[in-house]
């Protein structure tokens, strides 16, 4: 955690003060909140992950004035993330990994782990924020926001999380 606290604060700052409700090209929302949820340390049957994701979402709800939308989204994503990690990575491998990153998992396995979670985040956000899910505009929003955030997550990991930081916890 010692080496990863600065990138974590940078992501919080970006989400709250810079990228707060910024819409790119009328379809893309960049949300570093997804990156925080993805890179958080996995612990089997951990209530800590749910509590941290709730308060993280609550922090963004305060700044977005969104009445619990981000809290609900973060808790649902954190809950299904724990199930997805066991399904994709396996229980024996998760015990030896401190950080679920591209460096630790490899490119393809990280894509299989991260991209469905990112899609789920934007699907839940879109469903509750816009009120409709299967319109063409919402599907384009979900798809383009997911792709842009995945690219941002990969770039962030290669810039700020090098191989030396893998042994440290992201908590």
Q: Which positions does each model-derived feature cover?
A:
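Terminal, non-globular segments
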Residues: 1-171
